Amino acid sequence: MSPYISPLFSITMIMSVMLISSSGHWVFMWLGLELGTLAFIPILVWWHSSLEVEATVKYFIVQAMAAAVFFLGGMVSLSGDFMGGVNQLMGNIGDMMIMLAVVTKLGLAPFHYWVVDVVQGLNYIPGAVLLTWQKVPGLAVLTQLATCNNSSMLLLFGMVSALVGGLGGLGQTQMRKLLAFSSISHLGWLVVGCVAGSLLGLSYFTLYVILSIPLFSILHMLNGGHLNQLRTGLMFNPLMSVLLGVGFLSLGGLPPFFGFFGKWLLLTHFVGQLLLGVSVVLITGTLISLFYYLRVSYLCIVVLGPQQIMSGLNWRKMQLSGLMSGLLVLNMLGLFLVGGASCLPK
């Protein structure tokens, strides 16, 4: 692929988000979603492997079906304006169809099955884009839908996704599938954050991107598709093992790591709104998902001790690069951020 084509697709994906965010009509939302999808498909097959082609076809089929439901829901809602007494009913049906279409595009439970299969067939780089940036257009639409009468349904989707993401990753040894279920769990928190307020949702999404992109980059460099392959690669990269282990603990939201701060923000909001049931379900899903985060971190930090390192370098005398040092310090800032936010005036 020409080096000039990739920036074109990236700019198109950014423009799709701007189109959705600046418009309040379902037609422009639909156009923005499809513009981002079509621009992302060439990035999926960047390395031209058969697995990537298969994953791209699955992704296209799901997105096309969801787009058709979205457009049909918009037409149903529009037809209600010309049908007198059933206006409200048709409008509600149309809004529900639009919401279900966006939920399917995002991969929220129970419409999450395609996410795991697609991510498993992708390289880590397009997989990272799929699980981070490609969520932005759908979340922008859901943020606008949350102002309607669909907030309770979105809360339900978010809670179910948090639980499914935790339970689905328990028996996984494939790193891509594990990251896919992790994304589903975090997506549940993101949707709940969008219902709570766009600023809370944006804050949580920013934290998730900051934490997940370095993990995808390290796994891409190590080319670790399986836990056993990851262990072999980490035996020659002791500093990577520390960074990866701490990164997974932070992604799981374990205090005092950076990922704990995002979950704390949402939980304090819902406890303040007396939505204790939502808080309990989200915490339960996080505690379940912490099991596989701890398993990977245990493999990286504890199992691969200094005596097992085969890099030929001294474990204790090796120096961290500036990037690694920054990421390690950032991951340890969770409790400091919580303490600072607690001191702010209410």
Swiss-Prot record:
Membrane-spanning intervals of the chain: 1-21, 26-46, 60-80, 96-116, 122-142, 151-171, 178-198, 199-219, 242-262, 274-294, 320-340
Organism: Branchiostoma lanceolatum
Keywords: Electron transport, Membrane, Mitochondrion, Mitochondrion inner membrane, NAD, Respiratory chain, Translocase, Transmembrane, Transmembrane helix, Transport, Ubiquinone
Location of the protein in the cell: Mitochondrion inner membrane
Entry similarity comment: Belongs to the complex I subunit 2 family.
UniProt keyword ATP-binding, yes or no: no
PANTHER family to which the protein is assigned, alphabetical: NADH-UBIQUINONE OXIDOREDUCTASE CHAIN 2
Identification of the protein by name: NADH-ubiquinone oxidoreductase chain 2
